[in-house]
C-alpha cells in the first residue's frame, strides 16, 4: 500500500476543480494510478466507519448526481465547497451522465480529505450489475480500462448504506423495507457486499414511496417494493424519528414531500439526462433540524429564433420548510 502514501489529494482536488468556469463537458483526465489510489484509500475509510452512519447537523444533503459533473460543481458553489459545509450524498454518483469519472473522483477525494465531514451513501447504481449497463462501465473502458471499473466495484461494495442525523432524520438512497424491524439489522450487514436481488439491503437502495398504496405494493421497477404513507408513519413512530430523507426518483422541483411531510425525496441532477425539465435540490439541515432547500434551476430550453423576455441569471432559490 506504499502507493497510497504518495497520493496527492490536494493536487487531485485542484485539478478536478480547475474546470470551474469552463464550458460544461470539459474532461479532467487524472492518472490511472491516482484514481486507483482514490478507490483504495476511500474504501479503507468506508470500512473504518459504520455501515449505518450517525451524523450531526448542520449538514447539507444531496440526492442523485448521475455523472452530471458541472451540476455537482454548482451544488458546491451554492452550498460551499468542503470543508465550508458538511455534506451527505445519498448515492447514484455514476451512470447516465457524461462525466461519471470526474463526479465520483471528486467525491472520493473529498471523502479522503475530510473523512469526518463528508459522507457518501450507496445508491442502486453503485452496483456492478447496474453500472455495467447504464454507462459507467463504458466510460471507464473508453477513458481508461476495464480493470479500473473493477477497482471501483471493490470500492462501491464497501460504501455505507444509511445514515441517521441527530437521531431524528433517517437517510438512505431508496426507502424502507418490510424486513427492517431494528436498526441493528443494518449494522449487521457485512462489507464488502454486492447488492442482492431481494431483502433488506436491496430494499434500502431500491424501494419507492407510493401515495396510492396501502402498506406494501409491487414496484414497477421489477425490484423491491413500494410503500404507503402509513408504513412511513409507523416506522417513524417506532424508531422515534421525525423524517425519512431519500433520493432515487426524479422529482420536478428537486425535492418533494410525501406522507404529510414525513418523507422527502431529493434529486440533485437538474435537466436529468437532458430529457427532463426538472430542477435539482439540496437540503440544508441546521442545528435545530430545520430543513430548507436550495434549488438548482433547470437550464433554459433554447428555442431557435424565438424572442423571449430577458430573465435574470439562473441561480439559487432558497425555500424554507419547517419539519
UniProtKB/Swiss-Prot annotation:
Cellular component GO terms, alphabetical: cleavage furrow; cytoplasm; cytosol; dendritic spine; focal adhesion; glutamatergic synapse; kinetochore; microtubule organizing center
Region annotated Disordered, chain positions: 302-323
Domain of life: Eukaryota
Binding annotation for Mn(2+) 1: 64, 66, 92
Any one GO molecular function term: protein kinase binding
Regulation affecting activity: Inactivated by binding to URI1. The phosphatase activity of the PPP1R15A-PP1 complex toward EIF2S1 is specifically inhibited by Salubrinal, a drug that protects cells from endoplasmic reticulum stress.
EC number in record: 3.1.3.16
Key words, A-Z: Acetylation, Biological rhythms, Carbohydrate metabolism, Cell cycle, Cell division, Centromere, Chromosome, Cytoplasm, Cytoskeleton, Disease variant, Disulfide bond, Glycogen metabolism, Hydrolase, Kinetochore, Manganese, Metal-binding, Mitochondrion, Nucleus, Phosphoprotein, Protein phosphatase
Site location (Inhibition by microcystin toxin binding): 273
Effect of residue 50 to R: Promotes SMP complex formation
Catalytic activity, as annotated: O-phospho-L-seryl-[protein] + H2O = L-seryl-[protein] + phosphate; O-phospho-L-threonyl-[protein] + H2O = L-threonyl-[protein] + phosphate
N-acetylalanine carried by residues: 2
Gene Ontology BP term (one): neuron differentiation
Keyword Nucleus: yes
Similarity comment: family membership: Belongs to the PPP phosphatase family. PP-1 subfamily.
Miscellaneous: Microcystin toxin is bound to Cys-273 through a thioether bond.
Quaternary structure, from the entry: PP1 comprises a catalytic subunit, PPP1CA, PPP1CB or PPP1CC, which is folded into its native form by inhibitor 2 and glycogen synthetase kinase 3, and then complexed to one or several targeting or regulatory subunits. PPP1R12A, PPP1R12B and PPP1R12C mediate binding to myosin. PPP1R3A (in skeletal muscle), PPP1R3B (in liver), PPP1R3C, PPP1R3D and PPP1R3F (in brain) mediate binding to glycogen. Interacts with cyanobacterial toxin microcystin; disulfide-linked. Interacts with PPP1R3B and PPP1R7. Isoform 2 interacts with SPZ1. Interacts with CDCA2. PPP1R15A and PPP1R15B mediate binding to EIF2S1.
Name of protein: Serine/threonine-protein phosphatase PP1-gamma catalytic subunit
Source organism: Homo sapiens
Gene: PPP1CC
